[in-house]
A protein has these predicted regions:
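The beta1-alpha1 cofactor-binding region of Rossmann-like NAD(H)/NADP(H)-dependent oxidoreductases
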Residues: 55-65, 97
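Conserved glycine-rich cofactor-binding loop
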Residues: 12-13
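Conserved glycine-rich Rossmann-like NAD(P)H-binding loop of the short-chain dehydrogenase/reductase
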Residues: 26-43
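Substrate-binding pocket helix/loop in short-chain dehydrogenase/reductase
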Residues: 91-92, 96-104
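Hydrophobic positions on the long internal alpha-helix
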Residues: 81, 114-118
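Conserved small/polar residues in nucleotide/adenosyl-binding loops
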Residues: 126-128
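Conserved NAD(P)H cofactor-binding loop of Rossmann-fold oxidoreductase domains
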Residues: 83-88
Length: 128
């Protein structure tokens, strides 16, 4: 039986990292993506089931390229968990519109880019 595979974005910290370690410890192939390649490598070094795939989710083309790399390595992808996010908490009077645009670029559009990268693959798996 083939090992199951999960792709996790935002896999270098927080919920993404915790899920990566949990799935890897349960024997899954885990592809983790995030911007900070050094953190991805540190996590991958802790468990042979974890493979790093550096990615900035704000880059639509790169999202598709990385998903292709993951498919080529593991053949099948069972779950995608998109937990990429950024936040810089501030008092209302200190909020800068440029910073808020960056938050939306990563948190919203980055998730949309990730979904669009896998959409065709998962739709091809649907059988009625």
């Amino acid at each position: 039986m083939n090992k199951k595979t999960i792709w996790i974005t935002g896999g270098s910290t927080g919920i993404g990292k915790a899920l990566a370690l949990k799935f890897a410890n349960e024997g899954w192939n885990v592809a983790i993506s995030a911007r900070r390649e050094n953190l991805l490598k540190e996590i991958a070094d802790t468990n042979a089931n974890i493979s790093p795939f550096p990615l900035d989710v704000t880059d639509k083309t790169k999202c598709k390229q990385v998903f292709e790399e993951i498919k080529n390595k593991f053949e099948n992808i069972d779950i995608c968990f998109f937990s990429t996010g950024t936040w810089n908490p501030k008092k209302e009077k200190d909020i800068d519109i440029g910073q808020m645009e960056e938050v939306f670029k990563v948190n919203f559009f980055g998730t949309v880019n990730s979904i669009k990268a896998v959409e065709e693959y998962f739709l091809s798996l649907i059988h009625i």
